[in-house]
């Protein structure tokens, strides 16, 4: 419906940019996993599982302490800072195996939490009927971002190193953070009667 166009566009943009950032980093993760030692991949899988469980518990605790509108900017802001730290580590200690291993585990937690937060924002700002109608449209943003990410990484890899890939991903992650904040403002500007069911 016409009144839902801003929300649909914001949702598509949110998921496109989020998955673009993730898909840019995924090839880096695989490379770093190998750099950390092929013989250690089994332990990296175990560490990834443990970190994902721990991250979920920590995220649940933090979410219970802050306003729902603040969850997305806090979560995405935290991961943007993480990317800045990885960029600094790559610059200061290039080729460090522990940086590689940490990033391998970190990206899985990043993907799990950022996607969960994105869907929670949509469930906050849209009614169930709207979610049913707009789900496929909004989800198309994730597919487009996932397709574009590796191409962007390949293009940047020829002219920029890991440092710039991390910084580019941090900038891209800041944009879906703004899109999520826009969706909350859109919701505030629409009464329950206007939002429909």
Predicted features by range, described:
Residues 1-12, 38, 65-70, 88-101, ...:
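Intracellular loop-helix junctions on the cytosolic face of multi-pass helical membrane proteins
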Residues 2-54:
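Helix-loop boundary and gating motifs at the non-cytosolic
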Residues 16, 20, 96-114:
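Hydrophobic core of transmembrane alpha-helices in multi-pass small-molecule transporters
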Residues 31, 60-64, 150-154:
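Small-residue-mediated transmembrane helix hinge/kink sites in multi-pass secondary transporters
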Residues 42-54, 132-157:
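Glycine-rich segments within core transmembrane alpha-helices of 12-TM secondary carriers
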Residues 56-75:
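Conserved MFS/SLC helix-loop-helix module at the cytosolic interface between two early adjacent transmembrane helices
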Residues 75, 137-141, 168:
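Hydrophobic alpha-helical segments of secondary membrane carriers
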Residues 112-127:
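Intracellular juxtamembrane helix-capping segments at the cytosolic ends
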């Amino acid at each position: 419906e016409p009144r839902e166009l801003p929300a649909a566009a914001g949702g598509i943009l949110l998921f496109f940019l989020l998955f673009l950032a993730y898909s840019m980093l995924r090839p880096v993760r695989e490379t770093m996993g190998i750099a950390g030692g092929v013989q250690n991949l089994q332990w990296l899988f175990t560490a990834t599982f443990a970190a994902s469980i721990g991250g979920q518990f920590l995220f649940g605790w933090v979410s219970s302490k802050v306003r729902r509108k603040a969850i997305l900017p806090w979560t995405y802001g935290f991961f943007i800072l993480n990317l800045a730290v990885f960029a600094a580590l790559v610059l200061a200690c290039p080729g460090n195996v522990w940086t590689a291993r940490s990033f391998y585990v970190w990206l899985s937690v990043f993907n799990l939490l950022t996607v969960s937060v994105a869907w929670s924002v949509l469930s906050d700002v849209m009614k169930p009927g709207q979610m049913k109608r707009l789900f496929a449209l909004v989800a198309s943003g994730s597919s487009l971002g996932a397709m574009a990410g590796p191409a962007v990484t390949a293009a940047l890899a020829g002219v920029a190193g890991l440092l710039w890939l991390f910084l580019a991903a941090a900038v891209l992650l800041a944009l879906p953070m703004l899109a999520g904040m826009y969706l909350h403002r859109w919701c505030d500007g629409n009464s329950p009667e206007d939002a429909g069911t």
